[in-house]
Amino acid sequence: MKQYLDLLNRVLTEGTEKSDRTGTGTISVFGHQMRFNLDEGFPCLTTKKLHLKSIIYELLWFLQGDTNAKYLQEHGVRIWNEWADENGDLGHIYGYQWRSWPDYDGGFIDQISEAVETIKHNPDSRRIIVSAWNVADLKNMNLPPCHAFFQFYVADGRLSLQLYQRSADIFLGVPFNIASYALLLQMMAQVTGLKAGEFIHTLGDAHIYLNHLDQVKLQLSREPRALPQMKINPDVKSIYDFQFEDFELVNYDPHPHIAGIVAV
């Protein structure tokens, strides 16, 4: 995807070398935006192979409101293991905030359900926002949210989604984030009777870790291929009823996988 490769190039040419929480070191830029029109294909990176199984199961896990890594581990997904405690718990991370944001009356707000209902019944609202960045609850999260909040927008029968990501690990994390939120957009569009429009990805601190530079240069040497298509079971009508088997990525022909070490 040209949008992603342009981001890699920008960071390499314009970025500032910075220290970071993990001690690894990064090259970083502040503020970048990518746009993906889903009419042009599903934005799953082709310059290296992505592990789609992990992306799908993680999104379903978020939507269930689950915050324990055991569900992921049972399905062979290990991407959250580094931050889980001995019982698999991760604290009040994404799923908890999406589905059970605490209110001031002792109850909880299901932000996903509210977003679905607002898209259906008040599509011109400018308040269709889901936030994982709960300042009062950051201390209870094993990893504060990198992809912090997202907003939906309805126009001409099309549903679009914009994500703000405060911290973006461009080599390892961002390809997953692009595919995950594009998939969420398709799912939300289906259950609200709309067509999936555009996914807009806005990044805050966009960085390449110093131990990923060789992998990034290898990726930039590869020619992007045609985007695949994501087919979703049309019979699913609730955002909470999707199963792994309801998704099929067709015509995905990526270059080989490129390994990289996760900075913890």
From Swiss-Prot:
PANTHER family assigned to the protein according to its UniProt record, in alphabetical order: THYMIDYLATE SYNTHASE, THYMIDYLATE SYNTHASE 1
E.C. number(s) listed in UniProt: 2.1.1.45
Binding site for dUMP: R21, R126, R127, R166, S167, A168, D169, N177, H207, I208, Y209
Protein name: Thymidylate synthase
Gene that this sequence comes from: thyA
GO terms under cellular component: cytosol
Upper taxonomic lineage: Bacteria, Pseudomonadati, Bacteroidota, Bacteroidia, Bacteroidales
Record family assignment: Belongs to the thymidylate synthase family. Bacterial-type ThyA subfamily.
Amino acids binding (6R)-5,10-methylene-5,6,7,8-tetrahydrofolate: H51, D169, A263
Subunit structure, interactors included: Homodimer.
Catalytic activity entry: dUMP + (6R)-5,10-methylene-5,6,7,8-tetrahydrofolate = 7,8-dihydrofolate + dTMP
InterPro entries linked to this entry: Thymidate_synth/dCMP_Mease, Thymidate_synth/dCMP_Mease_dom, Thymidate_synth/dCMP_Mease_sf, Thymidylate_synthase, Thymidylate_synthase_AS
Function: Catalyzes the reductive methylation of 2'-deoxyuridine-5'-monophosphate (dUMP) to 2'-deoxythymidine-5'-monophosphate (dTMP) while utilizing 5,10-methylenetetrahydrofolate (mTHF) as the methyl donor and reductant in the reaction, yielding dihydrofolate (DHF) as a by-product. This enzymatic reaction provides an intracellular de novo source of dTMP, an essential precursor for DNA biosynthesis.
NCBIfam families: PRK01827.1-3, PRK01827.1-5, thym_sym
Keywords, ordered alphabetically: Cytoplasm, Methyltransferase, Nucleotide biosynthesis, Transferase
Pathway recorded for this protein: Pyrimidine metabolism; dTTP biosynthesis
